């Protein structure tokens, strides 16, 4: 028998067939329930829709090994804890780069709404989160859309990215390894990540503890490329010693 939660999610799916996104307030009005009820529906269990930046969007599905819908429901509180720490690094009037990934929207959410800042991103989900910040000037880089991770891969970096030198770049990664460095699942993410590594003044890697010791197919770079590594808890001694040797600040 279909539960009320399943029925509501089914209605949201039908609505998202007509539109690429649905604001939380509009969804609540459509279903005749509170916004908190919808938040609970989407947070309690994995669902084919997800709430990002105040908008309900359909989870992108493809043959990729890395699906946002699969990752989003994992270690939510741990990601949120790391994200809150990372957000404390933001100061007024800075220009910031935000990577793709399921931790990044939590960083944006944790930034004080009174702080004015400029943001550069290449992920649809990241952009939707930035839209909710009242004093954010957001730039979404265009290019070829990849549904598996909801990013736009730029065709010409001269169009937008090369006009920026971010104060801070916030990166996500699916793997963190002492010798292999920071890695992710998708090769198409690398051009923008590498651009940020060459142009930003400060580099901050934000990962939950499950990423340590993992190696994924696409290599971002050595860990020593990052000034700060933020996580939800202290990593193993191997990483602590490496950070001390390379003068990388650990935040947890």
Curated annotation (Swiss-Prot):
It comes from the Bacteria. Residues 22-41 bind DNA. One of its GO terms (biological process) is regulation of DNA-templated transcription. Keywords: DNA-binding, Repressor, Transcription, Transcription regulation. GO terms for molecular function: cis-regulatory region sequence-specific DNA binding; ligand-modulated transcription factor activity. It holds the Pfam family HTH_DeoR. InterPro entries: Carb_Metab_HTH_regulators, DeoR-like_C, DeoR_HTH, NagB/RpiA_transferase-like, Tscrpt_reg_HTH_DeoR_CS. Residues 5-57 form the HTH deoR-type domain. This protein is one of the repressors that regulate the expression of deoCABD genes, which encode nucleotide and deoxy ribonucleotide catabolizing enzymes. It also negatively regulates the expression of nupG (a transport protein) and tsx (a pore-forming protein). The inducer is deoxyribose-5-phosphate. Homooctamer. PANTHER family: DEOXYRIBOSE OPERON REPRESSOR, HTH-TYPE TRANSCRIPTIONAL REGULATOR SRLR-RELATED. This is Deoxyribose operon repressor. It comes from Escherichia coli (strain K12). The lineage of its organism: Bacteria, Pseudomonadati, Pseudomonadota, Gammaproteobacteria, Enterobacterales. The gene is deoR.
